[in-house]
Amino acid sequence: MSRQFAAQGLRSLSFVAFLCASTILGAAQSTDSFAFVLPSYLQGIGSNPLTSDDVFDIFHSKEPMAKSTTKVPMFFPASPPAVYPNEFRRIDGSRNAPGDLGRAGSVDLRNTTIGYADGSGTPGGATRKGAREISNLVNFQTAPIPNSVNVSGFVWNWGNIVDHDMVLTKVAQPADHFDIPIPLGDPVFDPNSRGGLFLTLNRSSALFVDGVRQQVNSNSAFLDGSVVYGSDKQREKEMRTLDGTGHLKTSDGNLMMFNVNGLPNQPPPDRGLDPGLFFLGGDERSNENLALSTMQNLLVREHNFWADFIKIGDPTLDDDGIYQRARAIVGAEIQSITYRDFIPILLGPNALTPYTGYNASVDPRVSLAFSTAGFRVGHTFLPPVLNRLDARNRSMGDVSLNEALFRPQLITKLGIEPYLRGLARQIPQEVDVSIVDGVRNFFTGVGTGFDLAALNIQRGRDHGLPSYNQVRIDYGLVPKATFAEVTSNLDFQSRLASAYSSPDDMDLWVGCLAEDHVNGGLVGETMFTIFKDQFERTRDGDRFWYESYLDAPTLALVQQQTLGAMIKRNTSIASEMQDEVFHVPTE
């Protein structure tokens, strides 16, 4: 056998090697009702170990693509037994932090100076240029600018998952308009100089706390897998099979279920589209773009993989026992991959202080500086097209970014593999002030359209974020006196000077993107500081953080998992994709 099976860690096993290994390991070990038992395909059930056919059926009954060949490498974990505590996360994030901080429906953390014009709730920025005008002056991009450090599309894609796991800010109901003026003669949205046109924007939902308008986070603020499972019981129940398997529901092709019962989802029903045509995920934005939908589908498969793993190990568990254990592992995987792989790429190595355990005095809520400005860094990564590749990494035809929005039918047609292969091989754009036209100049009709850069600027004003320099002061940084201190790029200096009088006047999101990057990272000093603060609080203020919640064997099992392994055990993808998927292959 060319590859050996190891009882610890992940190994790329041929199907034959996997089956051989499943027949030679020892008998089951007894555990209590909260034990996570080594699956019986690895240890046998008493004197009656599973047959090869049993193993095949369990892991591939819903994987027709993987079933078509025995040459696909399998990425199955092996682990000693482990025991969970007798408590699982609540779906809405309640009973985690003192005062239920971080629970779905909580207000975001405002840890900066209030930037509202009246100090209470009137949007800021009234003395600055309009958001679309600034977008045209600063955020334009005339040609592709590939990232200089060889990261793959999985960096922005995984960041999208992390963002949607931690925060969802809905719009106000009834509508409270804060529309974006379109400059007269705008080359995209007003080429005939009609004038008086706007890009529609509704203010975010908010509550007044101590006389100040504060935005509401509809998701659990914890990095807890809510992007997969939801942040409310109704959504969670809708997605579960409740049939004894512990599974999440799937549709044809082992894809996510569709929103057949019309739960809150995007696009909203007022668009006149049948909600049953769109995937239903834990977060309402699961259909936002094809890359995001692809990862959401993968995480549903990952849950069902672990549910099967656990079910075989302990057949006495009921549906909820299986489901909660699988949910705990997937949530832990998301945390592990984010902090071990994703954050060091974004911020550089050793950016966060070492973890020392749960700290009840830490506020785990998402800060407005993070959600409204900082973590919108992903928008500058976006490429003009999404690559789709076949099993030999040949193009299957690119999809333009504006054609990749709310198009689940393109996944039902081809599956998730072409998009995963594309993300693995495609270098995203540089982190800078430039945004591709696909999301900055998305024209949908006279006087209507979409500009993601302008939206980000306007949303910062809606949320009462202070200026760039004020945020630097609030986070303990020295303010910048000139645009040359913000960026060494002469072109960017010129762009900023055309839009703002000084760094004191600059919108936070724009200033963050313009900065020179910190050594070893992809972002500038201000964004680095905002991210460091947020990710340390997210970790330290979570009572269920995987490094302190899981027992040692289960923790070791989770820490062995990688995004590459997750992809290869849940799809037909094999050696055509690199194992370390956050960087493109160097060959």
Cite the ranges covered by each PLM segment.
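Short amphipathic alpha-helical segments with coiled-coil-like heptad repeat character
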Residues: M1-Q4, N304-A307, G476-E485
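Bacterial N-terminal signal peptides that target proteins for export
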Residues: S2-A17
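Classical Sec-dependent N-terminal signal peptides that target proteins to the secretory pathway
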Residues: S14-A27
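N-terminal accessory/cap region of cofactor-dependent oxidoreductases and related radical enzymes
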Residues: T31-F305, F309, A328, A332-A454, ...
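N-terminal leader/propeptide and maturation segments of large enzyme subunits in energy/redox metabolism
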Residues: A307-I322, H463, R472, G476-V478
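Short, flexible/disordered secondary-structure transition segments
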Residues: L317, G321, I337, D341-I345, ...
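Alpha-helical scaffold segments that form or flank carboxylate-/histidine-based iron centers
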Residues: I322-A328
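Short linear, low-complexity motifs centered on an aromatic residue
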Residues: A481-A499
